[in-house]
Amino acid sequence: MTNELVYEGKAKRLFKTEEAGVLRVAYKDDATALNGVRKESFAGKGELNNQITSLIFSHLAGAGIESHFIRAISETEQLVKEVSIIPLEVVVRNVMAGSLAKRLGKEEGELIPNAIVEFYYKDDALDDPFINDDHVLYLELATTSEMDIIRQAARSINKVLQELFNQMNITLIDFKLEFGRDATGNILLADEISPDTCRLWDKETNQKLDKDVFRRNIGNLTDVYTEVLNRLKQVQN
């Protein structure tokens, strides 16, 4: 196992492996908000997100959705296919919340009949601005056909995840996806799917089961992440 660091982000480190085209992802215990301005560490967070992401990506694979995920190799690590990340954050929204509610002057919790798919330019220096397809083409981030693939994949993933979280008695409010190109140019789902990247509300109480408890100082982050993992394990058994 090599320790040559390829990339370090807010929540993960990526390392080379002895196998060409395969990387090792190590999940960190750090939590950030306000695009990294606020940062704290929570013991066990990396382990929780690694397990949750591994289970969800495996579930998506069973539904025919390709991703970079290969397998988990430890409590905090997984192997993934090396991809070139497309600098787009793809956000799928099922219920009004967060920045969308503020932008449109709507109340949080209002159901969106047909899920909204949004794109944000992944650039910390610019604070990840909201962009549309024309901006994507102008910036040469992706082609028209790639955008079609990404948008369709996002909607397919949303359908599978909504069904999964419904079984967990959780409402999938919204979530962020990232995609990358493999060595042959195929578009694959990448990054992670966890309470770091999703808004999750308990169906009965509307209790927030995601990173909003950290952003808004309304609960214990590791407690709610553990609750999500436990519910996920129950429906996967």
Swiss-Prot record:
Entry-linked PANTHER family: MULTIFUNCTIONAL PROTEIN ADE2, SI:DKEY-6E2.2
Similarity section: Belongs to the SAICAR synthetase family.
Alphabetical keyword list: ATP-binding, Ligase, Nucleotide-binding, Purine biosynthesis
Pathway: Purine metabolism; IMP biosynthesis via de novo pathway; 5-amino-1-(5-phospho-D-ribosyl)imidazole-4-carboxamide from 5-amino-1-(5-phospho-D-ribosyl)imidazole-4-carboxylate: step 1/2
Record protein name field: Phosphoribosylaminoimidazole-succinocarboxamide synthase
EC number(s) given by UniProt: 6.3.2.6
GO process terms (BP): 'de novo' IMP biosynthetic process; cobalamin biosynthetic process
SUPFAM superfamilies, sorted: SAICAR synthase-like
